[in-house]
């Protein structure tokens, strides 16, 4: 008899627990996401042993962990003709021919926009 009352409670708790850890699709134009992606690009360029800057080519997937400001992003970046410390990387042309390099990366970044704090929790990149 006790199991009849415990089972529904256990299912509710498991359901709430399961829902709280899922990533959900988000709009790529969401302000907090856009700011996080600027940090991801800065982080990537800072950590490259390359004098040239990379820029976003395409965000393949953008997700946010439910009830948090943790973002998971799958993106592609390309090597530009500009140096990584140049001002306007967005308008730099991509390298072509022998210098051409493209990477596909997955980042998990936690954002606290109200204090301008971004933390890279995990990142993986491969050349394509």
From Swiss-Prot:
> Where primarily located?
secreted
Q: Where in the cell is it found?
A: Secreted
The signal peptide annotation in the UniProt record is 1-21
For this protein, the record's InterPro entries field holds: Cystatin_dom, Cystatin_sf, Cystatin_spermatogenesis
Q: Write the record's keywords in alphabetical order, separated by commas.
A: Disulfide bond, Glycoprotein, Protease inhibitor, Secreted, Signal, Thiol protease inhibitor
- Gene3D superfamilies in the cross-refs: 3.10.450.10
Which sites carry carbohydrate? 122
Q: Does the keyword Glycoprotein apply?
A: yes
Q: Name one GO cellular component term.
A: extracellular region
> What CDD domains does the entry give?
CY (cd00042)
Matching SUPFAM superfamilies, A to Z? Cystatin/monellin
Q: Where in the chain are disulfide-linked cysteines found? A: 82-92, 105-125
One matching Pfam family: Cystatin
Q: Which domain of life is it from?
A: Eukaryota
Q: What does this protein do?
A: May play a specialized role in spermatogenesis.
Q: Which family does it belong to?
A: Belongs to the cystatin family.
State what protein this is by name.
Answer: Cystatin-12
Q: Whose protein is this, by species?
A: Rattus norvegicus (Rat)
Q: What is the lineage of its organism?
A: Eukaryota, Metazoa, Chordata, Craniata, Vertebrata
